[in-house]
UniProtKB/Swiss-Prot annotation:
Belongs to the universal stress protein B family. One of its GO terms (cellular component) is plasma membrane. It is a multi-pass membrane protein. It comes from the Bacteria. The keyword Isomerase does not apply. The gene is uspB. It comes from Yersinia enterocolitica serotype O:8 / biotype 1B (strain NCTC 13174 / 8081). NCBIfam families: PRK04960.1 (NF003435). Keywords: Cell inner membrane, Cell membrane, Membrane, Transmembrane, Transmembrane helix. This is Universal stress protein B. Signal peptide: none annotated.
Amino acid sequence: MISTVALFWALCVVCVINMARYYSSLRALLVVLRGCDPLLYQYVDGGGFFTSHGQPSKQIRLVGYIFAQRYLDHHDPEFIRRCERLRGQFILTSALCGLVMVSLVGLILWY
């Protein structure tokens, strides 16, 4: 029989791996964005996005831009493809994090 604790930790590992994939895809998107649309790159603070002095409001703008699918009108197909991928990874990572939280509550109640 599979241990519930081992299953929980496996789920946590999968969630962390997907977070790393999301982070990597976001960095790659910003590199593409710098080349194809410098104005949008500045609008979302692409240069300071991953720094300690990054502006959270501009970071949330990029998340909103991608989640609302406003990138579909963009002229660069590479940018559109990367945004689609990032949006899918964001939804997957959010769902996995929610599942980890529900599993944690379940484990606390179980034991």
